[in-house]
Structures are given as C-alpha cells and as structure tokens.
Amino acid sequence: MAIFRDQAENHVEHDRSIEDRRRHRQLVEKSIKENLGDILSEESIIGETKNKKYKIPIRGIKEYQFIYGANNKGVTTGTGEERRGDRISSDKRKAISNNKAGNQEGKDIYETEITLEELMDYIVEDLDLPNLDRKKYSEIIVESAAKKRGYQKYGVRPRLAKKKTVMCKIARKQGKKRALREIGEEAEIGRFPFREDDLRYYKVKKHPKKESNAVMIFIMDVSGSMDNTKKYLARSFFFVLSRFIRRKYNNVAFEFISHTTTAKNVNEYEFFHKGESGGTYISSGINAAIDLIKEKYNPGVWNIYPFYASDGDNWSEDNEKAMEAVNEISDLSNMFGYIELLPSTYSTTMFYRFKKEISKKNFVSVTVKEKKDLWNAIKYMLSEELQEKNKE
C-alpha cells in the first residue's frame, strides 16, 4: 500500500534546492576570497569608486550522476586527503595545463561580478585594524547615532511611529464608545479615520560619546629608483589600507608624505597620482612624519600608525640617519610598518639592515617581490594575531 505524505505545510524543510543554494554561496565566497589578490593587483583599482565592478571566475556545480568508466581493471581508492568534490580515479588521461592540449573533460566556469564596496566587506572579514589603545585624555567627543527616546505629537514623516499612532486612534475610538454608552446611545461606530491628534512621532536624542583618536601616516618614496611598477604597488597597498580603515572606523585622521632627498606633506590626490624623480634619503620621509607627530599628534593623546613604502635603495650616507629615524618614530607610534617593494638584492637593501638592527617590538616589516605578494603583505601587516604578538 502506497503512503502519500503532504509536505505542503512544511515545504521549506523538504526543498532540495536549499542545499544547492547554500553550496553555491559557499563557492562564490570561496572564489572571491581566493581571487582577492588578483583583484588588488589590478592597476585600475586605485582611485576607483565603490561601484566599480570586477569579474571573478567561479567553478560551476554539477548534479550528481553515474558515468561510464574506462573499463580499467582494479579498484580505485583515495589517499585520505581528498576534499568534497574531488574526483577519485586511476584514469591516466591528462588534463589541460600550461596552455597545452589535453584529453580530459574540462570544468564549467562562469563569472560573477563584485563591486569595490563588496570587496571591502570580504577584506573586513579577514583583516582587523590594530587595537586602539585607550589612552589618558585620548578620547574625542563625537556625536553618536540618534536613539529613540519616547514619543511626541510633532515631527517629520520618516519618524512617524505607526504602531503608537494606531494605538492612539484605537484609544480615542474606545473613549468615544464609552462616552456614547454613558449617555445611553448605541455604541456602534462606523468608519473612524485618523486625525492629526492621533499622530505620534519618535522623539530622538543624540548623545555624545568618546572615541579614541587614531591617525594613519602614509609615507612613500617617490625617487627615481621607484619605477612605475614599484610606485603602483606602493599606491595599491596604501589605497586598499585607507579604504579598509575608513570603512571600519569613522574617526581616523590621515596624513600623506612623499619624499626623494627631501620630504613634503601632500594631499591625498597628489599622493596617489603625482610622480617625481631624484635621489633617496629615507630619513627625510620618516623625519617629516616625526615632525608632524610632534606638531599635531601628541603620542599621549593619539594612537599613531605610520606606514612607509620604499624599494629600500637608499643613499649610503643617509643609512645611519634612517636607522635613527626608524627607532625614534617607533618610540612615538603604536606600530610602524615598513614595506619594501621589489628588492633587487636582499642583503643590500634597508630591509636587511632594519631586520638586523631594529629591535622594537612594534616595528613590522614585509617585502613585496611581485604583484601577487601584495595581498599577503596587507594581511601580514594588519592581522589581529600579529598585533596581539606585538603587544606582548
């Protein structure tokens, strides 16, 4: 005897497409995270608006099905390292690789689009700004978001409290019924429209709150040894970093410094677009940041995070001054980050000297040897684990 069950009342639990949709979302998120490095290495990302779209390849999901084997003898087993979706086979057919021909079935690939704003959402998931220390007198007074504090009879339409308005209308209607019953009349009331007196609006009040001061100081070497590729890598690093921080925090100040043998404060547009040439004194850029800190950002009041990008090619007479400057700015800062771009010879760049001679716990240095290293450098600089280690 056949038994039929009606699943109409709880059809969601028996919707077979739910699992497919969940797996599809996982694949999309996985592909986006795996391609973050490629997106961030695009030169077009610098200065783009939040609605700029980027294409990301995603492997398609196929329905499970039985297929014919190759009539090979023996039994195929796994190695224990397989993941969901891997094909276990002893087939010797070769896949297409290195742009050469093969004889194995390909994978379905399609593209999805993601905006720069959505890209920042995924970056926020993986990265975290160094914790802002609560310093004495370090708070600034900012206006918090408005909070609802009761009701009032006047206000703007967006703040109309609909539920409270309906309750006032019902109370007025019930009051009228009681009045009619008291004078002996029929209490049945027909159409009962809203009146101006029924309207209630949310009363909002903005409360000041304290937030920690934080300033990010971006310093970039724009000398002749910094070719277009190096400058692009530096600007990409700073651009993504600034977008991420602005998205995560509302009250962070930014300062921009570019230098050759001399340094100068520039605005954000000049920092990301203007190029120069000349010799290199690393100390000039760092000393300019030190002067700026002493002038505007008291370390007892501000949380200070300078980041410096260079190819590490410094004029030899300036090396000792550069070492002194790095030590001094590290003492003034919560963290000082040094990014060295496309170093030609490891042992001759400032990265080697800094690693060997700078013992400050809050000094963090990375190298970017090619475009694909950019994303790892950003993660390394801002990883929460790294910051916790630096505090110890």
Swiss-Prot record:
Entries under Pfam families matching the protein: DUF444 (PF04285)
Name of the protein: UPF0229 protein CPF_1540
Compositionally biased intervals (Basic and acidic residues): 80-94
Protein family: Belongs to the UPF0229 family.
Stretch list, region Disordered: 75-100
InterPro entries, sorted: Spore_YhbH, UPF0229, vWFA_dom_sf
